[in-house]
Amino acid sequence: MELLEDLLEEARKLNASDLHITANQSVSLRIDGKLRKTKLLITKEQVSKMLAYILNEEQLHNLEACGELDCAFMDGKGLPYRVNVAKSDGQYLLVMRIIKLEIPSCEELLLPETVQALANLKQGLVLVCGATGSGKSTTLAALIEKINRERKLHIVTLEDPIEYRYVSKKSLIHQREVGRDTASFAIGLRSVLRQDPDVILVGELRDKETISAALTAAETGHLVFATLHTNDSTGAVNRILDSFDEGRQLIRSQLAEVLQAIVCQELLPKVVGKGRVANFEVLIATPALRSLIREGRTHQIASYLITGKQQGMLTKEEHRKMLQEKGLI
């Protein structure tokens, strides 16, 4: 569809992160974290044509049945997008996340050395946390690609939907999409364990079953990367523990045993030019931290983080100051 292709091309030219399309409303773009409205008004008929262009028959049927849908899409130039379709006041809306075709390197993202070193781990659980649109997927993609370039491993990703597309290099990579290649994250994770993986990427720890399967995968000698929608390390630990009504002590012990690091991030506008840069909090799982988790003293994690600089830990305040000193923000 020519109109949609033109909108997507313009969004990329403006370096937008998201394209918002709603029937009988102006098209909006999110640029450098701010929503900007255009003068283009989209009709209900145009939205229907866009949906028919983006979705296949099965997806259209699921959308009609459920009223909302997540999927991946490639435009006429083969450029990728993550799409969410839902209803607002009885009308369909589309939000299209623009995904870069090339996976950025850790250096391009200015990832702290402690974060880059997570790609060298052999096993355990690494959590990457932050709000929606904070760059979690991009950080994980850079780490997975670093492993792909440098290590001879079998990497399996579970995503909903698939965003960045990897090409196997030193590693062998298989990407599985929830809803297409597997029914759910939890079911996919249990299946992955029978596929001889070394590294597993879980797009989101969205329920108790997925969290439990991820902990088991890390416990059985795999390196597991996963995301959570929390703003800080304490919130991430509590989110996992609060997912379980029973057996809380067992989960505390299991998490304390397998956790390697928690990386929390937010995007800040650059002071010069356009674009944003990630500001990080990095918590490394030392023996002392494992004891805090095991003993249920999660309220002390924030204080412990401040004193962990020698172990490579980083608070957002410290990293923000580093970014300011470099003239980035």
Stretch-by-stretch model annotation:
Residues 2-329:
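Short, flexible helix-loop junctions that flank or precede catalytic/ligand sites
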